């Protein structure tokens, strides 16, 4: 049995949520999987449709971490067939007390703290008790080595994707009409969060349009920055 401990899981939407969902679904094809995930308002409808067991943990962030770790530790004590624990973040494994194999995914931002800082020392202490580190890119692996994580523990596995679904012809025609005579073509697929920096691309687009009058930038997603992005696009007269 595999245990998956995650802070990012559907029905919440996002890149990490998709990654952990895909990983869990793939693992469930070959072995039993138990998931410990954060609470989400619409989790019941979602969780009823899956083939594996999910425990949801709510409450404020600090207490939620401790509660989840307690539940995982108790589950491992009672289930001798657990072979490993897989987590989306080093903090998800920080309080897990077990001799079972521990695997942690890394993505770069969460480990990017100055070497020797309090955060860095805390990270290294956590990774000293982790057996395998899975980096999402060579860049992330090199960053991990640079901040002090044992290189021998790290392997690189690029994020996977589900096989593409067949797209209906009307959607293809709509996309072709939208992109007709447009070049270069830029696209961002993400949540509309401040840290994604959509506004910087849009501001650069105004200058690029002087060089490439037929350039198009398509933003796909949703989020709290949506209205601000639309407002900036209008102000720069880029909303064709």
Model-inferred region functions:
Residues 114-115, 145, 160-177:
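Acidic anion/phosphate-binding donor-loop and adjacent secondary structure
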């Amino acid at each position: 049995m595999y245990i998956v401990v995650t802070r990012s899981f559907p029905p919440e939407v996002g890149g990490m949520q998709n990654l952990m969902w895909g990983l869990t679904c793939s693992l469930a094809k070959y072995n039993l999987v138990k998931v410990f995930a954060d609470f989400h308002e619409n989790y019941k409808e979602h969780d009823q449709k899956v083939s594996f067991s999910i425990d949801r943990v709510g409450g404020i962030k600090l207490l939620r971490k401790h509660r989840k770790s307690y539940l995982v530790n108790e589950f491992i004590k009672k289930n001798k067939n657990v072979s490993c624990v897989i987590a989306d973040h080093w903090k998800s494994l920080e309080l897990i007390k077990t001799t079972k194999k521990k695997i942690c995914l890394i993505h770069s931002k969460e480990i990017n703290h100055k070497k020797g800082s309090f955060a860095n020392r805390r990270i290294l202490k956590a990774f000293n008790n982790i057996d395998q580190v899975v980096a999402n890119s060579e860049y992330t692996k090199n960053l991990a080595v640079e901040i002090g994580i044992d290189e021998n523990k790290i392997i690189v596995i690029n994020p996977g994707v589900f096989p593409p679904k067949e797209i209906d012809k009307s959607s293809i025609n709509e996309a072709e009409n939208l992109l007709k005579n447009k070049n270069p073509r830029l696209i961002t697929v993400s949540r509309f969060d401040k840290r994604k920096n959509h506004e910087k691309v849009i501001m650069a687009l105004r200058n690029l349009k002087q060089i490439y009058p037929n350039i198009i930038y398509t933003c796909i997603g949703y989020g709290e920055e949506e209205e601000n992005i639309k407002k900036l696009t209008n102000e720069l007269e880029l909303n064709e």
